[in-house]
Regions:
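Non-heme Fe(II)/2-oxoglutarate
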Residues: 1-83, 170
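Catalytic core of non-heme Fe(II) oxygenases with the double-stranded beta-helix
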Residues: 68-169
Length: 170
């Protein structure tokens, strides 16, 4: 299952998202990766626990979970805390699958079967950076408009092509 969800965020929300990301502190994305993914992950993520993270979650996740296509396609019971990632020139994320278990260690963990990527900037703002998802129909390459999202099985082998110029925000 691969489902593109258009217009999760409108222009006004995207503008607020970009301003919050501009104010945020980004850290090495490998800090949130599992042991296997650490070897292939080259990006930066917004530092968790920041004021910007809370505001972004209200904007982005609030819009996503209320979107009727997301409700129908993902049928979410529980939604993990998102990561806000930035890829600049030379950054990529090699082949990986998303962690099947989410939540804090020692309690509150749960299985995750659906992954979501929300595109936060326009595809012409960066070169490369395509999301490539392996499906039973072959590889699907996505570089969606700002504000659009895609959901796909967390068990799908996928990668992010190297960004050759500009900045990719998801």
């Amino acid at each position: 299952m691969l489902l593109v969800i258009p217009a999760v965020l409108d222009a006004g929300k995207l503008d607020r998202v970009r301003k919050l990301l501009d104010q945020g502190k980004f850290v090495d994305g490998r800090l949130s990766a599992g042991i296997t993914a650490q070897r292939v992950k080259q990006n930066e993520e917004l530092e968790s626990g920041s004021r910007q993270m809370e505001q972004l979650n209200n904007l982005v996740m609030g819009s996503l979970v209320q979107h009727p296509l997301y409700q129908a396609g993902a049928m979410p019971y529980r939604v993990a805390t998102p990561y806000y990632a930035r890829y600049t020139r030379g950054m990529a994320y090699g082949d990986h699958v998303d962690d099947p278990v989410m939540g804090p260690p020692g309690g509150g963990q749960y299985r995750s079967d659906v992954s979501t990527t929300v595109f936060l900037n326009a595809p012409d703002e960066y070169q490369g950076g395509e999301l490539v998802i392996g499906t039973s129909y072959g590889e699907q390459t996505l570089k969606l408009p700002a504000g659009d999202a895609v959901i796909y099985p967390s068990s799908s082998l996928h990668h992010i092509n190297e960004v050759t110029s500009g900045q990719r925000l998801v």
